[in-house]
């Protein structure tokens, strides 16, 4: 008799738990389906533009300039410090550039682009040190 009582109690608790779970998850699923909207990350959106293919002078951090000879670290620091730019050629108007530095910049203008400043990419100190190390 005790064994039957235990089995009945176990069945009761399992049944109540299942009913509670079914009732609890149904409103959650309905709420999720009704409020579904496509969320777009502004940084991912920016990567779909020329930003993902070239160095964006207004949004890229210093580390991106490593791939081009002569730009990192001195010119990269000057470029980031004097941003934002209206056009790629504005980078040649940075005060204090030597003729050699201007020549290096001219040789690399094809690798640059300029887009609107995106706060998610430039706020804080991330343009100088994004915390990614090899």
From Swiss-Prot:
Q: How does the protein's chain sit in the membrane according to the entry?
A: Peripheral membrane protein
Q: What note does UniProt attach to the cofactor annotation?
A: PSII binds multiple chlorophylls, carotenoids and specific lipids.
Mind listing the UniProt keywords for this protein, alphabetically?
A: Electron transport, Membrane, Photosynthesis, Photosystem II, Signal, Thylakoid, Transport
Provide one Gene Ontology cellular component. Answer: extrinsic component of membrane
Give a GO biological-process term. photosynthesis
UniProt keyword Transmembrane, yes or no: no
Subcellular localization, as worded in the UniProt entry:
Cellular thylakoid membrane
Residues of the signal peptide: 1-30
Q: Write down the superkingdom of origin.
A: Bacteria
State its role. Answer: One of the extrinsic, lumenal subunits of photosystem II (PSII). PSII is a light-driven water plastoquinone oxidoreductase, using light energy to abstract electrons from H(2)O, generating a proton gradient subsequently used for ATP formation. The extrinsic proteins stabilize the structure of photosystem II oxygen-evolving complex (OEC), the ion environment of oxygen evolution and protect the OEC against heat-induced inactivation.
Summarize the subunit comment.
Answer: PSII is composed of 1 copy each of membrane proteins PsbA, PsbB, PsbC, PsbD, PsbE, PsbF, PsbH, PsbI, PsbJ, PsbK, PsbL, PsbM, PsbT, PsbX, PsbY, PsbZ, Psb30/Ycf12, peripheral proteins PsbO, CyanoQ (PsbQ), PsbU, PsbV and a large number of cofactors. It forms dimeric complexes.
The protein depicted here goes by the name Photosystem II extrinsic protein U
Which gene is transcribed and translated to give this protein?
Answer: psbU
